[in-house]
């Protein structure tokens, strides 16, 4: 039996607020310890990330993206199935130019509804084709400066 709708809704709101706050601790605050994150489409070949993987990635990524804004366009919450979908636009400034992306995020709640247990996220493929090489180049060119963040 799924968790009560109001518990899931509160968790969903905390997830959105954590994302909007754009800090690693805030964004991960209501992820379960066994939460996984999968980048979509599946054909992108990006490996499944564990919470531990994300705890290493987010501080680096978030440190490179300033003036982050989140604009939520749609939220669909299917309480009987224990899941939700968020469609959002994000913007940020990076050392290598502006970042603008669209996200469709699919969330699954844990049994009691107080944590997000599974995430699947679809990004705008056109944006990512342009952004990822710039990100990779910046990280490679600044490895010494960013080194401590990668440990």
Swiss-Prot record:
So what EC number does this one have? 1.-.-.-
**Presence of keyword Oxidoreductase:** yes
Domain of life of the native organism: Eukaryota
Gene3D superfamilies, alphabetized: 3.10.450.50
Please provide, alphabetically and separated by semicolons, the GO molecular function terms listed in this UniProt record: monooxygenase activity
User: What keywords tag this UniProt record?
Assistant: Monooxygenase, Oxidoreductase
Pathway-wise, it operates in: Secondary metabolite biosynthesis
Q: Which InterPro entries match?
A: Fungal_Meroterpenoid_Isomerase, NTF2-like_dom_sf
Give the protein family: Belongs to the avfA family.
What does this protein do, in the record's words? Answer: Monooxygenase; part of the gene cluster that mediates the biosynthesis of the tetrahydroxanthone dimer neosartorin, which exhibits antibacterial activity. The two different monomeric units appear to be synthesized by the same set of enzymes, among which the Baeyer-Villiger monooxygenase nsrF is the key enzyme for the divergence of the biosynthetic routes. The pathway begins with the synthesis of atrochrysone thioester by the polyketide synthase nsrB. The atrochrysone carboxyl ACP thioesterase nsrC then breaks the thioester bond and releases the atrochrysone carboxylic acid from AacuL.
Q: What is this protein called?
A: Monooxygenase nsrQ
Gene for this chain:
nsrQ
